[in-house]
Every structure is written in structure tokens, then in C-alpha cells.
Amino acid sequence: MASAVVRVAGRRLSQQSASGAPVLLRQMFEPKSCTYTYLLGDRESREAVLIDPVLETAHRDAQLIKELGLKLLYAVNTHCHADHITGTGVLRSLLPGCQSVISRLSGAQADLHIGEGDSIRFGRFALETRASPGHTPGCVTFVLNDQSMAFTGDALLIRGCGRTDFQQGCAKTLYHSVHEKIFTLPGNCLIYPAHDYHGLTVSTVEEERTLNPRLTLSCEEFIKVMDNLNLPKPQQIDIAVPANMRCGVQTPPS
């Protein structure tokens, strides 16, 4: 693992982000899979991280990064997605020096593999990795070092959560992940999910702790709900999962 991805105590991280300009944040949307991609950058060092890029919008993301004068260090996936092909492969070719990152528990290839407690540094900032399995075994949530925002992937959505009926998902595991790894964050911590299907963009920990119709249930009730969703499988799953297992180390097929 490269030295830029290291285990760092939360207190030290908070001190790093307490001075200077706030983190640069851009939320971008891909309409076919209703996926949010997040660009975070340090306004001083110009180092940046991109979370959950999508193949169809990778050139858009690269153009924005260039326009803002940023250097993309990492293209990060919160998990091995089933509804779209990751844009990490294209971004690595468009932006030399960018490395792909994913949880080691995903089983996917990447330049760097991370796990619980690892931190991804960019300038004065860092993202803490919190394992949040359940939607898939390799799901992670990324928490900015001052705990002002969390990027929850498919583990926690706005008034919802990721499904648990494929990719070795487990409703009980997801319930405990959200309650133990996300709902323990400060109430005003902003929640940025990987998807939204209703035009919503951001929530907070307190909102989801009190208003999320699934995750305010008991664990037993939650499992019953998740086991009876009867959703169709994602349209791209047979193409997306094999491509995403390469996680951008090899350019995905177009």
C-alpha cells in the first residue's frame, strides 16, 4: 500500500482540516443509473479525490478536474457496483498519476486496497474508511476528517438503503453497519449517498436516524422488509460486475 494511504487517529485528522480554506466539494449526477459522483479537493495543494465515478461521465469529470486546476490522486469506489461500470479505468488514462482504490474485501483489482480505519489523504484533508458491509461485503463509507460529511455509497441512501438480495448481501449486516458506523457520527454530519431516485441530494445523520423508514425499524423488522422487496435485478449487472471487478486497473469495455 502506498504511503499516501495510512492509518491515522481521528484527532490528528481533525487538526489537519481545522485551518485554511474549507474542502472543495462538487456533486455530479449520472442520470442512467442515478449515480452521484463526488469530487473533493484541497484548495491549497490542489490535490483531489473522486468518489464513485461512472464510465459514461468520466470525460466530464476529467474536464472539470482540469478546469479547476486540480491534481487527481485517487479515483475511489465505495464498492463493486452492479448498476454501472466504474469510470476509474478511463480516468487513469486521462489523468496520469491517478490511482484506483477499493476495499480489499470487494475482491476487485485496484492500484490500492483499503480497509477499516485506513485514510486517504489529499492535501490537508483525509477520508477515513469505515467498513459498512451488507449491500455487498466490500462496501465502505468515507468520512471527512472533521466528520462534517460522509459518503455512504449504497449502504445508506436518503430515506432508504441499498438492497441486499444479490452480490452476497445481508440485511442483518447492513442494519448493524449503518447503526454502528454511520449513525454514530455527529447528527449534523452531512450524508452524501451514491444514488438517489427522487431528486434529493443530501441528508444528515440526524435526519436519517429519525426519519429513515427502514432504518428506524428494529433489526428483525428491517430484515423482513429487505427480504420482501422483490426488485428486478439491475439492468447492467451482467456487464457491470465483471468490469468493475477490474476496478479500473484495466480500462473497462465501452
UniProtKB/Swiss-Prot annotation:
Species, as recorded: Mus musculus
UniProt GO BP: glutathione metabolic process; hydrogen sulfide metabolic process
Residues the entry annotates as binding Fe cation: 79, 135, 154
Lineage summary: Eukaryota, Metazoa, Chordata, Craniata, Vertebrata
Modified residues (N6-acetyllysine): 32, 66, 172
UniProtKB keywords: Acetylation, Cytoplasm, Dioxygenase, Iron, Metal-binding, Mitochondrion, Nucleus, Oxidoreductase, Phosphoprotein, Transit peptide
Catalytic activity: S-sulfanylglutathione + O2 + H2O = sulfite + glutathione + 2 H(+)
Protein name: Persulfide dioxygenase ETHE1, mitochondrial
GO molecular function annotations of the record: identical protein binding; iron ion binding; sulfur dioxygenase activity
Domain of life: Eukaryota
